[in-house]
Amino acid sequence: MIMLTTSVAEAAHCLKQGQVLAYPTEAVWGLGCDPFNELAFRQILALKQRPIEKGVILLAGDVGQIEYLLADLDETIRAQVIESWTTRSVDERAITWLLPVSSDQVPTWITGQHHQVAVRVTNHPLCVALCHAFNGFIVSTSANPAGLEPARSLQEASAYFGQGLNYLNGDLGLSQQPSRIIDATTGRVIRD
C-alpha cells in the first residue's frame, strides 16, 4: 500500500515490509529501504534508473548501528570518523565515509563494484528517529532519476516518482549541499 505519512513508526513499518520510502534528509530528499532486502533495493535502482555498480550510502541513526563496520579501521582514523559524526552541528554539512568492507558485512548490491561501503551517521532528527524505529541503518540515495537534480521537497519527490513509493513528510535539514564523501583509508575527498 502506498502512503503519505508524518509517522516515523509507519514509515519504519514500510521499510520492514520491504517497501521503498522517500524521506527528507540533511540537504535533499532521499530514497531508502532495508539494505538487506534485495527486491526493495532493486526497486530503488529502477526508480532512479541507476546502475547497480555505483553502490549507495547507508544511513545510521547513531554510531552503535554501524559499529561493526568500523572494526577494521586504524584506531586514530576510527576516532576521527566517529568525531566527525558526533560533534557536527545540525547546520554543518554531513560527512559520508567510505569504509573498508567485506561481503559478509553488507550485501554486495549495496557496495556495487566497490570494495568499500559508504556510511553516514545522521544528526537530522527525522532520519535519526527513522533509523531508531527501523532498528538499524537504511539505504539512503538521493530522490531523483539519473541525470536530474535531487528533490528538495515532497512535491518534487512525488513529481519524480508519483505513486511508486511511500513518503515520510517532514522538513529538510539546514545543509545546502549533499554530504561530503571521504575515503577513510586514504583521507581522499571523493565529493566535496
Swiss-Prot record:
Compartments, as annotated in UniProt: Cytoplasm
EC number(s) given by UniProt: 2.7.7.87
Example GO BP: tRNA threonylcarbamoyladenosine modification
A single GO molecular function term of this UniProt record: L-threonylcarbamoyladenylate synthase
GO cellular component terms, semicolon-separated: cytoplasm
Main localisation: cytoplasm
Pfam families linked to this entry: Sua5_yciO_yrdC (PF01300)
Domain YrdC-like span(s) in chain numbering: 5-192
Catalytic activity line of the entry: L-threonine + hydrogencarbonate + ATP = L-threonylcarbamoyladenylate + diphosphate + H2O
Keyword field: ATP-binding, Cytoplasm, Nucleotide-binding, Nucleotidyltransferase, Transferase, tRNA processing
Annotated function: Required for the formation of a threonylcarbamoyl group on adenosine at position 37 (t(6)A37) in tRNAs that read codons beginning with adenine. Catalyzes the conversion of L-threonine, HCO(3)(-)/CO(2) and ATP to give threonylcarbamoyl-AMP (TC-AMP) as the acyladenylate intermediate, with the release of diphosphate.
Family: Belongs to the SUA5 family. TsaC subfamily.
Protein name per UniProt: Threonylcarbamoyl-AMP synthase
Organism: Acinetobacter baylyi (strain ATCC 33305 / BD413 / ADP1)
